[in-house]
C-alpha cells in the first residue's frame, strides 16, 4: 500500500503521466531565415539540451509575415504538450495593436518559458559609401527626402519603428525596404541595392572584413569590437534599442513541463559554448524566468499599445 500511495501523485501529474518528458523530439519554430547571432546561439543551446535530455530540438525556419509565423502556428495549431515551441520577440507582442482584427492576445495566448537575450542593432553602409558618419547619412536623407533607402527585417519591427522615430526627430526621410530577415539586407547591401542597413548584427562579419562601415550602434554602451562607433545615446537621442527575445509555447502548458524546459534551457544558456557565442556577438544578457518573462510581456504590451497608437501604425 505504501508503494501505491507513492505512485499515485505521479500519475496525477498529466504531463508526466504517460512517459518521462521529453520522450520525442521537440519542434522549434524560428520566424526568420537561418544565419546570424540568433541562429548560432539557438543551435548551441539545443545541442546542450539534447546532450542533457537525450532528445533533439529540431529548428524550422519559417520566415515572413514580419516574424509572426511561429506565433501564428502556436495560437492556431500548437498543442500545449511542450513539443512545439517558438522564438518569441517584441513584434509578436506588438502585432495585435497593428490591426483591427487581432489574432491573439500577446500575454494570454502564449506560455512564456524563458527570455534569453536581445538583438544588437546598428546602422551600416558600404565601406565605399560617401556617408562616413551617422551625421552624413542624416544630412543626405534631409537633403534628398526618400531617395536613400534602408533595410530592416520587416514592417513594424522594433528596428523599423526606432529608425522612423530617429528620422522623424531629424526631420529627414529615407525609404524603408523590409526583408524577411536581416541576412537578406546584408545581401542587398553587398549588391548595392540599398543605401544602408538598420538591423541586427548580421552585418558584423562584413564590418570586421572592411566591406561595411558601422555608423551607429543601438546598445546602451559601445561595443568592445567597435569602440569608436557611437551609440544612439552618444549621438544625443536618449534611447537604446535591444529588442529582447526568448522561448514560448502555446497557452495552457503544464507547470511541470514549463519548469523542466526552463531549467534545461537555462542550463544550456549558461553552457560555456553558449556564453562564448554571446561574447563573440556581444549579445546582452536579458535572461528572465517564466514568471518574470510573463510580467515583462504584460508591461511591454501596454507600452506597445500606446506607441502604435501614438505613431498611427497599421498593417491593415
Language-model segments: which ranges?
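Solvent-exposed coil/turn segments that connect beta secondary-structure elements
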Residues: 90-92, 118, 128, 201-202, ...
